[in-house]
Amino acid sequence: MVEKVPMTQGGFVKLQEELRWRQQEERPRIIEAIAEARAHGDLSENAEYHAAKEAQSHNEGRITELEDLTARAEVIDLTKMSGDKIKFGAKVKLVDEDTEEEKTYQIVGDQEADVKAGRISISSPIARALIGKEVGDSIEVNAPGGSKAYEILQVSWG
């Protein structure tokens, strides 16, 4: 069975946009760069040609990856999410039990994660610790800097 990749609608749209750009804009640009470099003659010492071929390889690899991700995407409609228990898509407000520092994270798909923007991957240690918990619960997360304890202050959706 094919493993589904959970993501938000916004994350899915971003993947589709990148796929379209790589197929319809980047691919033709690289093909043109290869043709132009090939016209310069000897390919064995043609740095432009080798750079363009490397760019082509990278682009085609990413296209394959994006096609796979979009085919396996399980788009979760966050507008239909609710409840007290934390699951994919939840926005969770936490307080560090040692420093009293408050943080808010939204649990999103791996491709959408951006810690600086407050979006953490569903497969991250903190998200895994949060899943199934609710307001008032405490969690302990083994982070690179050691173990951290958080209390869940708020769970919201959308």
UniProtKB/Swiss-Prot annotation:
GO BP of this protein: DNA-templated transcription elongation; regulation of DNA-templated transcription elongation
A GO term, aspect molecular function: RNA polymerase binding
Pfam families: GreA_GreB, GreA_GreB_N
Entry keywords, A to Z: DNA-binding, Transcription, Transcription regulation
Gene3D superfamilies recorded: Transcription elongation factor, GreA/GreB, C-terminal domain (3.10.50.30), Transcription elongation factor, GreA/GreB, N-terminal domain (1.10.287.180)
PROSITE patterns to which the protein is assigned, alphabetical: GREAB_1, GREAB_2
NCBIfam families, alphabetized: greA (TIGR01462), PRK00226.1-2 (NF001261), PRK00226.1-4 (NF001263), PRK00226.1-5 (NF001264)
Cited function: Necessary for efficient RNA polymerase transcription elongation past template-encoded arresting sites. The arresting sites in DNA have the property of trapping a certain fraction of elongating RNA polymerases that pass through, resulting in locked ternary complexes. Cleavage of the nascent transcript by cleavage factors such as GreA or GreB allows the resumption of elongation from the new 3'terminus. GreA releases sequences of 2 to 3 nucleotides.
Homology family: Belongs to the GreA/GreB family.
Protein name, entry field: Transcription elongation factor GreA
